Amino acid sequence: GTENAIFSVNNTYLEILAPRAKGAGADFVNSVIDADGEGLAGLALETSDIGRLKKELSERKVPTKKIVSGAGLDSQQNKSRTWQNLFFSRDLTRGLFIFAIQHESEKLQKSEVSRSTIDRLDHVVVHTNDPDGFVSLYRDKFGIKLSLDQTVEKWGGRMLFFRLNRTTIEVIGKLEKDGIPTDSFWGLAWSVSDLKAAHRRLTDVGVEVSNIRDGRKPRTIVCTVKSHTRGVPTLLIEQLDR
């Protein structure tokens, strides 16, 4: 029930969905837009063996739904792709739309990358009011590596960094649990090889971009994309030690 546009980068892909017909997919997209407007709707975690993943999660007492198959058709190239999904309840994921996916067809073709284009997803930002509960789910149950857990005294909060597939789930929260455990997506940070070239290219085509500035991470420079992001806070980042 949806029309999808897929943008492939080195370590993941961004999938944009729009409702086009009746069906569960269209119902989901419409519900997200009705509730929050356009923006970041969900996170897909790839697995090479979705049946084994479901079994392992069951052994860890993690409730899962049935594995469901999906298919998509590229009407322009007359190509199809197939996959299997394992969805998790919003009660488990504390409000986030999270699911596991196993691709059955060939890998998506990567886009041609120049120094002024995005080469990979650097990190996705999530807000939480229950950092300990987030660690319990994503590290202890999902098995995602927690690389760093730090307290930031400057603003009285806590930051968690989960690493997988050359990207990071960056979690920002309060020091202690506050109310009903709730997580929410915030934004995306994309890595580029040459931020000045990317900034110039975007400005030339009418995209509003902030001035380049030093990033919070040492030896990085960043800029904020301020238009055309469809409600998704978007940062571009260059690692200066490449």
What are these model-derived regions, one by one?
Residues 1, 18-25, 51-66, 132-156, ...:
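Extended intrinsically disordered, low-complexity coil regions enriched in Ser, Thr, Gly, Ala
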Residues 114-173:
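Aromatic-anchored, glycine/proline-accented short structural segments
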Residues 34-39, 62:
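Acidic/polar active-site rim loop that often engages polyanionic ligands
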Residues 15, 51-117, 153-154, 160-163, ...:
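Vicinal oxygen chelate
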Residues 1-23, 237:
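An N-terminus-focused feature that recognizes amino-terminal "leader" regions
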Residues 21, 25-34, 176-178:
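ER-lumen resident redox/N-glycosylation machinery signature
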Residues 39-50, 55-57:
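A generic, well-ordered mixed alpha/beta core segment in the N-terminal half of proteins
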Residues 38-45, 99-135, 185-188:
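N-terminal beta-strand motif that seeds the catalytic metal site of vicinal oxygen chelate
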